[in-house]
């Protein structure tokens, strides 16, 4: 396996620190704003005198809080007992889903996703010994993963398909028409359709991002995280919701892995999914920072693609260079950025 991109960024920052160079870190999505006090207090209150193993699926109060969030935010009804599961953030869940649902060898041994992409989709597929099928996304297709642009033979082989909108790292959102089309195609070909929705509450321009579960639940899973939304990157807390049969299968897998979140973290997460004010306050902070950076890019003649949502700006490098070389030039003066190549082949 290649070195995980964020580990490379950590190495770069360590080198700069050793040289005494002031670091301006724009490379890792790890907010510096304090975790809201209401969530920290909930974690403290959730620490009991007697410590016991947490339930695999998550505590009932947390699952009920998630169900309430999905109803309020998307108008989606999910059963807290059968259609929701707590996770250790989103990364471990996204990594484990190919291991859970891809059967190798078989005639459905392929994991499909758009590229640029969160590296975990590919890495999870490789650990599952599945074939990967990254679909190039770009200006030519509006960074929108379209099933009708894919060969039928690929769709037939697909076991797991990852959608990721708002898109990491570009911030593009998927039109409703393509969400509907993916649900239709999933019904025809029978793959597991996974929607990584970690940035769905961090939007700035245009209509509010949608959830896959608004368009269908059968064969579908939506994965959410509290990391950026609620400033809980170090807590490792999220959830997966959707088709009850898929949740049941995944629960059996997770029971063997022993990956249930700690109960005191689940106590904080219960409040985070229930209380919306802190999300609005954090979004205002991110929007202000985004405005500063967009203006800086405009002044410098740098073109920004997408970035309607999420925590990142997808910036086109100047003509005559590439993303890796440009990131190196930035790093020489202490500015740490992630080159597009970290998110896929030919991504500059």
Feature-to-residue mapping (PLM):
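Helix C-cap/helix->beta junction micro-motif
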Residues: 16-19, 128, 188-189, 300, ...
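Conserved glycine-rich beta-strand-loop-beta hairpin in the small C-terminal domain of fold type I
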Residues: 270, 286-294, 304-316
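Conserved C-terminal alpha-helix-loop-beta "cap" of PLP-dependent enzymes
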Residues: 14, 303, 315-348
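Conserved core segment of the aminotransferase class I/II
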Residues: 213-287, 295-297
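Conserved core of the PLP fold type I
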Residues: 51-184, 201-202, 207-216, 221
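N-terminal small-domain helix-loop-helix segment of the aminotransferase-like
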Residues: 2-89, 93-96, 272-274
